[in-house]
């Protein structure tokens, strides 16, 4: 069993969280004529921004996060987007106005930190201060009155406070800004939209009340009957074999599935990033080797399985209880590389993660799957229509 000391270690604030004053890195807003502007609060590595921008009609103009390594990843993959590093509760109105300038904010999105809600969290409770960060989204709405608000969180929010917390968020969004919002909420499973992972997320979408079109959540596209779910084999089978603590930087084969072709669509010069295996002790290597694919590697941690080729991954986590590598590879005696974790989250291979193995796990585990975000974005665009400027 995990000890009290280990429990404390995995629930304390990470040293990678910025504790200084908020820092703005201002970029000249790119030309986005005919596209909608996006501000991504609590942006993390950028899964929401990536998926929404993949609609080709939405452009991120500002990303905000307290996690230093995640924001480095965000900036690397969004080089024309302004960023603020810091606690959203410490960012004053003037800094937001300086960051955004004269640009009208069309969409604000927030993957509000989930540790206070998540069923995986050892300290889950209604008093956790992180549960109230959504009020910072409300403050932002009052400043900029965006057309659409998107908030993402884990399914565990539904049961927090016997459902009262979920209701309170919807009511707070409904009355926000100068005109208020028509708010809908839905529990979506990323696997239903092509992500090779069972990842259920509670999504709130608010559309400003002066916009007459009604928002509807996207219908599932995969059902394992007419459109089979994406499997681990679909996602990972083209990536090079790795030994313990080995890195490979070029592909060894062509894509073997439609999903892999999508992941490699923008790869340049066959260059492969973030594909390094963890450095396991011999005991861990033997444990993975002796575990049947699809079964738990540890008796006390049923979600810590060795993946099988023909399934979807259970929900990826950012860290927490041991073993931190979380999943074993289906036919190699090791945990997953960051690239494999990114594939399971539907990040394409040209999306590069900054930081080492542990930070890569945190960033991929916290992220919104871009494929899920894109489907939400497509539904939002049905409401907004073409932007005329």
Predicted regions, residues:
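N-terminal intrinsically disordered, compositionally biased regulatory/targeting segments
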Residues: 1-15
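C-terminal target-recognition/interaction regions appended to catalytic cores
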Residues: 2-5, 254-389
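Core alpha/beta nucleotide-donor-binding catalytic domains of modification enzymes
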Residues: 11-41, 45-145, 155-159, 164-166
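Generic recognition of flexible, low-complexity loop/linker segments
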Residues: 27-28, 192, 301-305
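Proline-centered helix-kink/hinge sites
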Residues: 79, 112-113, 146, 196, ...
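Class I S-adenosyl-L-methionine
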Residues: 94-102, 115, 119-297
């Amino acid at each position: 069993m995990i000890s009290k000391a280990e429990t404390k270690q995995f629930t304390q604030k990470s040293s990678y969280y910025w504790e200084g004053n908020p820092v703005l890195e201002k970029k000249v807003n790119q030309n986005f004529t005919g596209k909608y502007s996006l501000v991504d609060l609590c942006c993390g590595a950028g899964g929401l921004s990536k998926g929404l921008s993949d609609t080709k009609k939405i452009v991120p103009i500002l990303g905000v996060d307290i996690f230093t390594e995640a924001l480095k990843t965000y900036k690397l993959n969004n080089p024309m987007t302004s960023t603020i590093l810091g606690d959203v509760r410490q960012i004053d109105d003037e800094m937001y106005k300086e960051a955004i300038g004269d640009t009208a904010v069309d969409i604000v999105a927030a993957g509000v930190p989930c540790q206070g809600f998540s069923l995986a969290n050892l300290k889950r409770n209604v008093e956790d201060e992180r549960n109230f960060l959504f009020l910072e989204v409300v403050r932002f709405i009052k400043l900029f009155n965006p057309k659409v608000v998107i908030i993402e969180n884990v399914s565990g929010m539904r049961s927090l406070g016997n459902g009262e917390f979920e209701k309170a968020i919807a009511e707070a969004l409904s009355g926000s800004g100068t005109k208020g919002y028509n708010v809908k909420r839905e529990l979506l499973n990323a696997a239903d939209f092509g992500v090779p992972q069972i990842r259920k997320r509670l999504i709130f979408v608010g559309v400003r009340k002066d916009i007459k079109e009604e928002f509807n959540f996207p219908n599932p596209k995969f059902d394992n009957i007419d459109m089979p779910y994406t499997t681990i084999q679909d996602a990972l089978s083209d990536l090079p074999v790795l030994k313990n603590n080995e890195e490979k930087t070029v592909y060894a084969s062509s894509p073997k599935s439609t999903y892999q072709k999508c992941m490699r669509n923008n790869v340049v010069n066959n260059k492969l990033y973030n594909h390094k295996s963890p450095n396991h002790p011999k005991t861990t290597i033997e444990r993975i080797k002796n575990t049947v694919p699809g079964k738990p590697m540890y008796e006390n941690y049923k979600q810590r399985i060795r993946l099988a080729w023909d399934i979807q991954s259970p929900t990826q986590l950012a860290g927490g209880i041991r073993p931190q590598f979380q999943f074993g590879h289906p036919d190699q005696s090791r945990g997953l590389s960051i690239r494999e974790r990114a594939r399971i989250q539907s990040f394409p291979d040209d999306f590069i993660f900054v930081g080492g193995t542990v930070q890569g796990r945190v960033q991929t585990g916290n992220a919104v799957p871009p494929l899920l975000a894109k489907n939400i974005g497509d539904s939002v665009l049905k409401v907004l229509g073409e932007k005329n400027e």
